Regions:
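Extreme N-terminal starter segment of soluble prokaryotic enzymes
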Residues: 2-3
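Conserved acetyl-CoA pyrophosphate-binding loop and the N-cap/start of the following alpha-helix
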Residues: 84, 88-97
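C-terminal "cap" of GNAT-fold acetyltransferases
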Residues: 107-111, 115-122, 127-131, 135-155
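Short alpha-helical segment within the catalytic ATP-binding CA
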Residues: 79, 92, 120
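Acetyl-CoA-dependent GNAT
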Residues: 7-85, 100, 104, 153
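Conserved phosphate-binding and hydrolysis motifs of nucleotide-dependent enzymes
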Residues: 58, 62, 90, 129
């Protein structure tokens, strides 16, 4: 079964924001962990039509946010439903995201940033073809965290 991408509705945004809770250190990714991120995610104007619900069958399984950096470079944020993480779904999901971005936006590069403690995600991104670009520190969730910026060169 394939993944389907559709513009995120307000109802779907609220489900993700208030019902998707991750275990342990991954709770960092809970939308409610940072008020500014939560407000932006729930605000239709801020979200625009570049945040997508990702469904498989009739189930919402993930989301994908896309921000245009230049005509050919797009920065993404993505999240999988907590009960589906760590179960081998990542490669297929990430490849579907890349295919969607390339087909809709004609991208040359895709960038993303991930906390350096998220070794599971970093391993996945590298496996699919993302390369490390730089590390940086950012204030979020009430503290300062180190992030790794990664780049995928579209073929």
């Amino acid at each position: 079964m394939t993944y389907k991408f559709s513009v995120l509705t307000q109802e779907q945004a609220e489900i993700i924001a208030f019902n998707w809770h991750y275990d342990g250190e991954y709770s960092f990714y809970d939308m409610e962990a940072d008020q500014e991120d939560l407000d932006e995610f729930l605000n239709l104007k801020d979200r625009g039509n570049s945040t997508f619900a990702v469904t498989k069958g009739n189930e919402m399984v993930a989301f994908l946010s896309i921000r245009k950096v230049t005509d050919r470079i797009f920065d993404i944020g993505l999240g999988m439903r907590p009960d589906l993480t760590g179960k081998g779904n990542g490669i297929e999901f990430l490849r579907a995201c890349i295919h969607f971005i390339q087909s809709v936006y004609k991208s040359g590069k895709i960038t993303l940033s991930v906390t350096t403690f998220n070794h599971r995600a970093i391993k996945l991104y590298r496996k699919v073809g993302f390369k490390d670009e730089e590390t940086f520190k950012q204030n979020t969730n009430g503290s300062t965290f180190e992030f790794l910026k990664m780049v995928y060169e579209c073929k």
